[in-house]
């Protein structure tokens, strides 16, 4: 059916892997895992819950009766209680102890944390694969001189690989932030309606040790080290913001990467992959548009804007909780992850298929190199007895005249011919050609690139070698 809206993130951009993490199946199966963890922990701490009841809960943890839950929600207008009811229909013996002592946020918020963790683990996998692809490209082209740009004006040469190392460094910073945020991630735990654990104190006859143990046991059963020490009814919505700082950072890095590729493609130096039957324009048949890089920039802009939702939502929470977070959070958090997933898959695809045109790179570099070589030329002339100030003025005049030929007349850069013809400078054309070797102007760019990959990137690739080899698919 095509008669209703569907999110492009779902239909066009995000991977099936990420879409599953934010699917109803993953969400409601996690609810049931949390109810099982709660019941098991309460039993282990002495409540009257039987092995048979827990076995019944486990037997139906994955076969969710959505129709029963949906019908119940129409009646009671409460999603959690509707699923408690539906689970109880399948588990009549365990029905009395489902959700015992808990509030809605026990399943809602803990599940949100679990979903974000799973989604962030996938983001980490994608990011590691991107680091790997970009590192290979950087090392392969670390020695190839190219024109650098500041203010998008020609500047001191760098190398193709060193420029890629700049992209790599941006994504490395995102990886480091991701690792930190994952290391700090905690569950809400079992905190009750206002975060005081009052209902659990009642259940356990005011036994503080058991109530504290309940939190820890649930965390461990769900694969976490700990729960938040204090909270209201919900975990602090600042957590959503902190997680999205990782995605926003990735979007910032991807924007720079994709914009650089778009500019390089305009100059015909480097292109993103272009499929054999791909069409660039419906009117201009010759066009090879950088549509993947443009999509990266477009989706990244969405993520950068989306993080404002989590910032405003966090600040707007009243006292122990308010519900104006809910609708916004249901949109902003999943869509940020879906968009970041799409961005990273696109970045991997583009970086892995970059097409380099060495002759065009050399052409552009040699067109500008005479201007950049003037200081070296002047130093050579000074060593032969010339006056630095007089030489500077002569080279300045020659540079202005050569620039005029290029810009006004559309001619070739004849600066070297002018310098060679000036007897006051005393440098021959052959000597100028020796000075004009591009590799003499790139400084430590090749060494910087290799050292950066060896010292900063390779340890990550070694640590997470089991994550490499991700197969990404670009749908359109």
Q: Where would I find each of the regions flagged by the language model?
A:
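A helix-coil-helix interface module used to build multimeric assemblies
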Residues: 1-198, 206-219, 280-281, 291-295, ...
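Glycine-rich cofactor-pocket loops
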Residues: 139-161, 271-287, 320-327, 352-372
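Active/binding-pocket-proximal capping segment
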Residues: 271, 394-401
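Long, amphipathic alpha-helical stalk/connector segments used for oligomerization, subunit docking
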Residues: 302-388, 394
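Short beta-alpha connecting loops at secondary-structure transitions
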Residues: 19-23, 68-70, 278-298, 320-335, ...
């Amino acid at each position: 059916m095509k008669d209703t809206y569907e999110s492009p993130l779902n239909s066009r951009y995000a991977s099936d892997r990420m879409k599953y993490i934010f699917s109803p199946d993953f969400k409601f199966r996690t609810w049931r895992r949390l109810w099982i963890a709660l019941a098991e922990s309460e039993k282990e701490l002495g409540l009257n819950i039987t092995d048979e009841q827990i076995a019944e809960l486990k037997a139906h943890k994955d076969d969710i009766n959505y129709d029963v839950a949906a019908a119940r929600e129409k009646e009671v207008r409460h999603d959690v209680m509707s699923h408690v009811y539906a689970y109880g229909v399948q588990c009549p013996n365990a029905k009395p102890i489902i959700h015992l002592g808990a509030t809605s946020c026990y399943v809602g918020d803990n599940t949100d944390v679990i979903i974000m963790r799973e989604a962030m683990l996938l983001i980490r996998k994608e990011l590691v694969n991107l680091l790997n692809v970009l590192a290979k490209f950087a090392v392969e082209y670390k020695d190839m001189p190219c024109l650098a740009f500041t203010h998008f004006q020609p500047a001191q040469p760098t190398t193709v690989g060193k420029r890629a190392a700049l992209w790599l460094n941006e994504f490395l910073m995102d990886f480091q932030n991701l690792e930190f945020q994952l290391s700090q991630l905690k569950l809400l735990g079992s905190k009750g309606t206002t975060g005081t654990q009052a209902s659990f104190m009642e259940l356990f006859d005011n036994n503080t040790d058991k109530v504290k143990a309940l939190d820890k046991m649930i965390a461990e059963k769900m694969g976490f080290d700990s729960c938040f020490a204090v909270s209201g009814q919900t975990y602090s919505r600042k957590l959503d913001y902190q997680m999205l700082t990782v995605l926003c950072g990735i979007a910032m890095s991807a924007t720079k990467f994709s914009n650089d590729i778009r500019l390089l493609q305009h100059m015909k130096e480097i292109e993103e992959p272009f499929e054999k039957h791909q069409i660039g324009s419906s009117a201009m048949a010759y066009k090879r548009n950088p549509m993947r890089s443009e999509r990266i920039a477009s989706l990244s802009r969405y993520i950068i804007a989306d993080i404002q939702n989590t910032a405003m939502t966090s600040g707007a929470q009243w006292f122990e909780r308010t519900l104006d977070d809910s609708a916004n959070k249901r949109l902003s958090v999943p869509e940020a992850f879906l968009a970041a997933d799409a961005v990273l898959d696109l970045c991997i695809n583009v970086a892995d298929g970059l097409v380099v045109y060495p002759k065009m790179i050399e052409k552009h570099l040699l067109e500008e190199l005479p201007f950049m070589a003037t200081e070296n030329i002047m130093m050579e002339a000074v060593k032969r007895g010339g006056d630095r100030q007089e030489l500077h003025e002569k080279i300045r005049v020659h540079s202005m005249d050569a620039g005029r030929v290029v810009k006004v007349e559309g001619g070739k850069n004849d600066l070297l011919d002018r310098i060679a013809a000036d007897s006051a400078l005393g440098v021959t054309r052959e000597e100028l050609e020796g000075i004009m070797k591009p590799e003499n102007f790139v400084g430590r760019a090749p060494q910087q690139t290799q050292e950066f990959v060896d010292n900063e990137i390779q340890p990550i690739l070694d640590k997470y070698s089991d994550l490499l080899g991700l197969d990404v698919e670009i749908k359109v």
